[in-house]
Amino acid sequence: FEEWDDRGRRYGILVAAAAWHWVDPSIGWRRAHDVLDPGGWMALLGHVVVRRPGEPEVYAQTADLHERYAPGNPDWGHPPLEADVRTTDSGWGLVEDPGDLFGPTVVRWYPTVQWLDGDGFADLLRSQSPYRRLDPGAREPLLDAIAERIRTRMGDRVARRYLGVLRVGQRTS
């Protein structure tokens, strides 16, 4: 985005879906402002894995396995509570604020849930960075143990909750 040749074109909307955090913050907001028409809109889409109080949560049921196969990993831990994530319902969330380049944001939340069996949950984890970074000699036994735990202690059905968020702001003059 930072080096993209816009050929002088201007746009009514610019959308970044789970990618804005990769854009150089010293360039990104100014560049977004400059490629938008006056009054154009900037939209950031993202999501967070969340949990709800009182609902069985996979990490709580498998913390001992995580520590057995990959002890001390700083990536392990409970997802945040959905209600806590919703407190970030103003501004641009966790990315750097654009200052006066954009007006006030409109924020909308979209909760979704994905139901998985033990094998499906292990396959999902295989695609995620904290697990991909593990040595396969630790990763595969850990994921096999997680799948087995889900099958035997959680009825072979777990929820993976996501809270999608849309943050939209209009370009200022």
Model-derived regions: residue spans:
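Portal/gating segments that form or line small-molecule/metal binding sites
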Residues: 1-2, 168
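A short acidic, Gly/Pro-enriched loop at the edge of an enzyme's catalytic core
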Residues: 2-14
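Tryptophan-centric aromatic hotspots in well-structured domains and transmembrane helices
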Residues: 4, 22-23, 46, 69, ...
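Short aromatic-enriched loop/helix-cap "lid" or pocket-rim segments at secondary-structure transitions
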Residues: 7, 54-58, 120
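A short SAM/SAH-binding and catalytic strip from SAM-dependent methyltransferases
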Residues: 11-26, 48
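A short glycine-rich, Lys/Arg-flanked "PGG" loop and its adjoining helix->strand segment in the class I
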Residues: 26-40
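Conserved catalytic/acceptor-binding region of the Class I
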Residues: 37-112
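Conserved Class I S-adenosyl-L-methionine
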Residues: 83-86, 90-173
